[in-house]
Curated annotation (Swiss-Prot):
Cofactor binding comment, as recorded: Binds 2 heme b groups non-covalently.
Gene Ontology biological process: mitochondrial electron transport, ubiquinol to cytochrome c
Role played: Component of the ubiquinol-cytochrome c reductase complex (complex III or cytochrome b-c1 complex) that is part of the mitochondrial respiratory chain. The b-c1 complex mediates electron transfer from ubiquinol to cytochrome c. Contributes to the generation of a proton gradient across the mitochondrial membrane that is then used for ATP synthesis.
Main location as per UniProt: mitochondrion
Species in which this protein is naturally found: Macrotarsomys bastardi (Bastard big-footed mouse)
Other observations noted: Heme 1 (or BL or b562) is low-potential and absorbs at about 562 nm, and heme 2 (or BH or b566) is high-potential and absorbs at about 566 nm.
Cofactor: heme b
Xref: CDD domains: cytochrome_b_C, Cytochrome_b_N
Family classification: Belongs to the cytochrome b family.
Subunit structure: The cytochrome bc1 complex contains 11 subunits: 3 respiratory subunits (MT-CYB, CYC1 and UQCRFS1), 2 core proteins (UQCRC1 and UQCRC2) and 6 low-molecular weight proteins (UQCRH/QCR6, UQCRB/QCR7, UQCRQ/QCR8, UQCR10/QCR9, UQCR11/QCR10 and a cleavage product of UQCRFS1). This cytochrome bc1 complex then forms a dimer.
Name of the protein: Cytochrome b
Residues annotated for heme b b566 binding in this entry: H97, H196
One Pfam family, short name: Cytochrom_B_C
Cellular localisation: Mitochondrion inner membrane
Length: 380
């Protein structure tokens, strides 16, 4: 008799994805982030569901309902801070996951990579709308500033913004629809993540060397299930430490002031995970140009497979491109720092230089270094 996990239609899918899946024997801890993102998503859906039971999407009561959750609901403060800081952990894992993909050349799996980019946009949209829901000062003004960027689109811009707002300003209609979208999007993300995995399992995983690993595969379970559990425990340790010791470390104090359309905060800025893109947006003096740069800062990832010039897939044996990669990482840290600073000298010029460097490394220097490295290899 065949084992039920190999014969049952439902268990068979799980078996082929998480148990008998052939995996390369040399994948490092950088391959843990896929499973960590899955854990983050599940955590966000569960905590979000419990928050939605007590939250009211109305401008008059939204702020009070969040306060009520923190003060009166059993462990409401814990659920709220797990959800808020869980989003930060989600983005940490997301950035490391994408960085791993760039470093080891995983973007050559075109379908998997492109769905990953769609996932990144979906998660960013979800996080943005979630930030609006507590209806604090930064929620309101963040929503106003970011949605207003769409007015830069020629001809239809203003109409589009008013259509999204459901009126002539960010108000009750905006809050209600943002709550609806914030609730539905994580389930769409979960579905997309399954498609992401489906395409990945068509090709099999990449590995640090970037070479074909078909000759040396091991079963996913028990080796990588145990390895993933260790990663999950470390993730939970960091998240719980953050929630219990410093829950407001990554938040903005302005969001503890109820939204007031008549009073603009001195520095409007998004959550830390959007600051790099916000810095790129602000570094261009033209509104439409800034919006295009903002979108392209993420969309540029879709060009990576086309910009790959090297005969080698991974950066493991490519020292020149390695240096460029780490300069790019440092540049992203710089942009994140600049995004949180006021718009004044010297921050403006630093942001502009960092933005130019960001696009130059990806579009010009990395493809050239790939060609140079191939030529150096030919000499030997």
């Amino acid at each position: 008799m065949t084992n039920i996990r190999k014969s049952h239609p439902l268990f068979k899918i799980i078996n082929h994805s998480f148990i008998d899946l052939p995996a390369p024997s040399n994948i490092s801890s950088w391959w843990n982030f896929g499973s960590l993102l899955g854990v983050c998503l599940i955590l966000q859906i569960i905590t979000g569901l419990f928050l939605a039971m007590h939250y009211t999407a109305d401008t008059t009561t939204a702020f009070s309902s969040v306060t009520h959750i923190c003060r009166d609901v059993n462990y409401g403060w814990l659920i709220r801070y797990l959800h808020a800081n869980g989003a930060s952990m989600f983005f940490v894992c997301l950035f490391l996951h994408v960085g791993r993909g760039i470093y080891y050349g995983s973007y050559t799996f075109m379908e998997t990579w492109n769905i990953g980019i769609i996932l990144l946009f979906a998660v960013m949209a979800t996080a943005f709308m979630g930030y609006v829901l507590p209806w604090g000062q930064m929620s309101f003004w963040g929503a106003t500033v970011i949605t207003n960027l769409l007015s830069a689109i020629p001809y239809i811009g203003t109409t589009l913004v008013e259509w999204i707002w459901g009126g002539f300003s960010v108000d009750k209609a905006t809050l209600t629809r943002f709550f609806a979208f914030h609730f539905i999007l994580p389930f769409i993300i979960a579905a997309l993540a399954m498609v992401h995995l489906l395409f990945l399992h068509e090709t099999g995983s990449n590995n640090p060397s970037g070479l074909n690993s078909d000759g040396d595969k091991i079963p996913f379970h028990p080796y990588y299930t145990i390895k993933d559990i260790l990663g999950v425990l470390l993730l939970i340790l960091i998240l719980v430490s953050l929630v219990l010791f410093s829950p407001d470390l990554l938040g903005d104090p302005d969001n503890y002031t109820p939204a007031n359309p008549l009073n603009t905060p001195p520095h409007i800025k998004p959550e830390w995970y959007f600051l790099f893109a916000y810095a790129i947006l602000r570094s261009i003096p033209n509104k439409l140009g800034g919006v295009l740069a903002l979108v392209l800062s993420i969309l540029i990832l879709a060009l990576l497979p086309l910009l790959h010039t090297s005969k080698q897939r991974s950066l493991m044996f490519r020292p020149i491109t390695q240096i460029l990669f780490w300069i790019l990482v440092a540049d992203l840290f710089t942009l994140t720092w600049i995004g949180g600073q006021p718009v004044e000298y010297p921050f403006i010029i630093i942001g502009q230089l960092a933005s130019i460097l960001y696009f130059s490394i990806i579009l010009i220097f990395m493809p050239i270094s790939g060609i140079i490295e191939d030529k150096i290899l030919k000499l030997y």
